[in-house]
Each structure stands twice: as C-alpha cells, then as structure tokens.
C-alpha cells in the first residue's frame, strides 16, 4: 500500500535526514490486507525514527501534543489507532508542543 507521510512542527528532526515528506510502501501485517494506524505507527518507529522515539510515541500511540491527520481529517474522527488506511492516503503528524 502506497502512503504519503508528512512530519512537521519539529517531528521531522527525529527522522533520518530530517525529511518532512516520505513516500512509503507498506505491506499489511494481517491476513485481511488492511493497514491500520496502529500498524503504521509501529512501522514508523522501526523504519523512520532515528532518535528519541519517546518524543513521537507513548506506548502504541502518538504522545499527547501530536496532531494526526488522515487526508486532512483528525484521526480520532477516523477511528484513531484502529483507523483503516487506503491506497494513496496522506497521513500528517504535527507536533503542537514547542518551547517559548
């Protein structure tokens, strides 16, 4: 499944080369051919995050203060960790936490 992942608000600094936009190809982990957000977050942790994963994740989810959008819609409205992703979806992660 081809997805576009975008990172902003400083989250891109946790990734290799600090790249904001990533075009990725994920294979479903289960037998029904679906990719859900929980699986995507585990994949991001294993494949994209190169330092301080605790700044992005808390347990199996994103940490408080990280806004997640699936095709410009708040992921909580789409099902949160159980939200099913579809081919060519765009998932955006934005940190709303910053110093002052």
From Swiss-Prot:
Entry PTM: C-terminal thiocarboxylation occurs in 2 steps, it is first acyl-adenylated (-COAMP) via the hesA/moeB/thiF part of the MOCS3 homolog, then thiocarboxylated (-COSH) via the rhodanese domain of the MOCS3 homolog.
1-thioglycine carried by residues: 100
A GO cellular-component term linked to this record: nucleus
Linked residues for Glycyl lysine isopeptide (Gly-Lys) (interchain with K-? in acceptor proteins): 100
Keywords, ordered alphabetically: Cytoplasm, Isopeptide bond, tRNA processing, Ubl conjugation pathway
Record has tRNA processing as a keyword: yes
Subcellular location: Cytoplasm
Keyword Metal-binding recorded: no
Pfam families: Urm1
Molecular function terms from GO: protein tag activity
PANTHER family assigned: RURM1 PROTEIN
Protein family according to the UniProt entry: Belongs to the URM1 family.
Function: Acts as a sulfur carrier required for 2-thiolation of mcm(5)S(2)U at tRNA wobble positions of cytosolic tRNA(Lys), tRNA(Glu) and tRNA(Gln). Serves as sulfur donor in tRNA 2-thiolation reaction by being thiocarboxylated (-COSH) at its C-terminus by MOCS3. The sulfur is then transferred to tRNA to form 2-thiolation of mcm(5)S(2)U. Also acts as a ubiquitin-like protein (UBL) that is covalently conjugated via an isopeptide bond to lysine residues of target proteins.
HAMAP family per UniProt: Urm1
Protein name: Ubiquitin-related modifier 1 homolog
Organism of derivation: Oryza sativa subsp. japonica
Primary gene name: URM1
């Amino acid at each position: 499944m081809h997805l576009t992942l975008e990172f902003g608000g400083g989250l891109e600094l946790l990734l290799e080369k600090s790249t904001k936009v990533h075009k990725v190809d994920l294979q479903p982990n289960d037998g029904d051919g679906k990719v859900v957000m929980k699986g995507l977050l585990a994949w991001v942790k294993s494949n994209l995050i190169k330092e301080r994963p605790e700044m992005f994740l808390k347990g199996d989810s994103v940490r408080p203060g990280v806004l997640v959008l699936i095709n410009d819609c708040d992921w909580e409205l789409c099902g949160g960790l159980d939200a099913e992703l579809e081919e060519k979806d765009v998932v955006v992660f934005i940190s709303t936490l910053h110093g002052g």
